[in-house]
């Protein structure tokens, strides 16, 4: 949590945020958040459309996700999409005024061969479609992330999902530390980061602050 009053920016610590939560009503917090957003962002929004570029049969057991092979769901299951289909989807979104386009794949990560296929898709989109590029492809290696950046991707998405102290209650097949490592590697590769989480999965109010 960070509050800014020009020219000084001040980042709240855990104890301060906890005290603010305990002594301020939800309505007051919503109003303060609205005022900060209005002051520093106004009515501007950043639009990003995602394409489910590989669906289902994920090896991870994340309790919140229908893509996991451990859950019985009725989602479509298909392999990595073709280049032409992805380019057409990006072009459709660009024609609607969307500013960013992201390929999102199920699964823990991509193989090097899959990474090369995805990078070829991004290079073609970059040549043919006026839209900025993002990616959400799992726990990639440093080398794979560098390839993405060289292919024109600007933002990498990797959600932390919840507080580190609660993560193991929701997922046992990877750790918050692995996510943090991926994010750090993405930064080193020159990518900007998009990372968030889900509120309301059984975590405590204190863990929500820990997550923030």
Segments from the language model and where they lie:
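Short, small-residue-biased leader/transition segments that mark boundaries at the very start
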Residues: 2-6
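Acidic, glycine/proline-rich low-complexity segments that act as flexible tails and inter-domain linkers
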Residues: 7, 11-36, 40
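Conserved, mostly hydrophobic/aromatic
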Residues: 9, 33, 62, 103, ...
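N-terminal pre-triad scaffold of radical SAM enzymes
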Residues: 30-71, 78-102
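Core AdoMet radical
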Residues: 70-89, 93-183, 192-196, 201
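Short glycine/threonine-rich loop-to-helix capping motif typified by GTGT followed
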Residues: 112, 206-209
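Oxyanion-binding "anion nests"
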Residues: 197, 209-212
């Amino acid at each position: 949590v960070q509050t800014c009053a020009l020219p000084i920016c001040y980042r709240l610590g855990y104890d301060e945020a906890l005290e603010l939560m305990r002594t301020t009503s939800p309505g007051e917090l919503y109003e303060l958040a609205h005022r900060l957003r209005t002051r520093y962002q106004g009515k501007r929004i950043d639009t990003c459309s995602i394409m489910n570029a590989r669906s289902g049969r994920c090896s991870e057991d994340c309790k919140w996700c229908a893509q996991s092979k451990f859950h019985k769901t009725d989602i479509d299951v298909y392999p990595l999409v073709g280049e032409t289909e992805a380019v057409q989807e990006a072009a459709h979104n660009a024609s609607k005024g969307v500013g960013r386009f992201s390929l999102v794949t199920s699964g823990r990560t991509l193989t090097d061969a899959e990474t090369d296929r995805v990078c070829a898709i991004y290079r073609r989109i970059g040549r043919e479609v006026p839209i900025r590029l993002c990616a959400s492809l799992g726990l990639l290696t440093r080398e794979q992330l560098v390839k993405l950046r060289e292919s024109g991707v600007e933002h990498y998405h990797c959600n932390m999902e919840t507080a580190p102290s609660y993560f193991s209650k929701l997922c046992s097949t990877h750790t918050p530390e692995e996510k943090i490592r991926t994010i750090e590697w993405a930064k080193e590769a020159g990518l900007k980061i998009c990372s968030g989480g889900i509120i309301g999965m059984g975590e405590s109010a204190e863990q929500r602050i820990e997550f923030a």
